Amino acid sequence: MVTMTRILGPDGQPLRLNEIREPQTAQLTSLHHEVAGHPSRGLTPSRLASLLDSAEQGDIVAQYELFEDMEEKDGHIHAEMSKRRRAVAQLDWDIVPPDNATAKEKEAAAALYNLMQGLDDFEEVIFDTTDAIGKGFACQEFDGWQRVDGNWLPKAIIHRPQSWFQLPRGVRQEIRLRGPSGGTPLQPFGWITHVHKSKSGYLERSALFRVLVWPYLFKNYSVGDLAEFLEIYGIPMRVGKYPTGATEKEKLTLLRALAALGHNAAGIIPLGMELDFLNAAQGDPAAFQLMIEWCERTQSKAILGGTLTSQADGKTSTNALGNVHNEVRKDLRDADAKLLAKTLSRDLVYPIAVLNG
């Protein structure tokens, strides 16, 4: 059991126990009171391009707020990301001693396993860590440390929004809390920091959601166009006829009656005026549906590596192809799990082992 007031952190530097009793962000009230900007509202291609350029230049806030909006507003992205994230979160886990472990090492691994089992929110921690799969990185803060039955354990582990951080570039890119002069380094034994790149490069460009932003935007346009199409072409045209010499007030009364019929299927008009219903205009919504389907297939390919575990079109969805795509999903799950295990071993298991060693 650690009894000294100083121990060595993962960087080899001395760490005082009183420094980790409270969360690092406890005094950063400005971050806690921030309200998201929701950049998806009124998003256009030019605004999106500008937002992505700003992220590459160091201002990542709007990009990661957009990522949050995408997962919240696009049901297909939410469903596919949920499949991938929960495929990892539902796996069984264990604390495994090293190869050719001594009896003492095996005993230590078993003790660590019991301590980890005592974390009430560990399943939630695993799920929140997988937030990095879509966004490139995810940070969870220890809400300080406390003694539980004589052992040091985190009070709670809280997911923090990616918009709280900045990604200064150097010899090695870091994740830091937003602030002046390049931000504030994350406190040792204070964070679980998981990095999950979808492609090589700087973190602000390597997130999976960077691939999904354009299909998301195109799909939004197509959904809006389809809604407008259905509104125009799916409702019978209503024409009102007023007699020669009708006053402006009478014309306005007729117009209001037409509007009421469109929404309430009821209305009144003055005697002598007429209402005619024409057939709905003819049109084909297939073009809009085709674009929406293309966007969703692209999203599924990017997230799950294929489409046949998500959608069946009755044409290409054979059992053999479905099995192939399911194997791809398993490969992704296993790769995700390896990255997750490495992060949790470094940022959660190791601190618990050191503080209770």
Predicted features and spans:
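Structured, contiguous alpha/beta core segments that scaffold functional sites
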Residues: 2-78, 86-88, 93-99, 103-261
